[in-house]
Each structure stands twice: as C-alpha cells, then as structure tokens.
Amino acid sequence: MTLWVGILVGVVALLIGVALGFFIARKYMMSYLKKNPPINEQMLRMMMMQMGMKPSQKKINQMMKAMNNQAK
C-alpha cells in the first residue's frame, strides 16, 4: 500500500512541477518579448530613414528575408 502512495505522490509532484515550469517560462518569455520586440518592416523603415537612406520596399524585403534566414 505504501508503494502506491509513494508512486502517486511522485506523479502528482511531477505534474505540479511541469505546470509550474510552464507558467514561469511563459511569464519570462512574455516579459522578454515586451522588453525586446521582434523587428518588423516599419521598424526597419524607420532605422533606414534615421541612417539617411531612402527605404525602398525592395531593400526592406531583402533585409527582412536576410534577418529571417539568419534567425533560423
């Protein structure tokens, strides 16, 4: 009888640990993305304008494609 209780306690503790880990990781990722948002086309356009470049759609598409390929 005590073996079953030990196994049950172990399984319950494992499930609680998995659930707790999931929510902690989710909260961390949400705060990380809030502090460091991913770059989109509008941000690239603004960066290029600040550097004195005239942002063409072709150049923006090339930069986005290069960034997406680098992230993989």
Swiss-Prot record:
**Coiled-coil zones:** none
Return the Pfam families for the record.
UPF0154
Instruction: Please provide the record's keywords in A-Z order.
Output: Cell membrane, Membrane, Transmembrane, Transmembrane helix
What subcellular locations does the record give?
Cell membrane
Give the highest taxon in the source lineage.
Bacteria
Q: Return the GO cellular component terms, semicolon-separated.
A: plasma membrane
For this UniProt entry, which segments traverse the membrane?
Answer: 4-24
Listed NCBIfam families: PRK01844.1
Q: What is this protein called?
A: UPF0154 protein RBAM_017710
Taxonomic lineage is: Bacteria, Bacillati, Bacillota, Bacilli, Bacillales
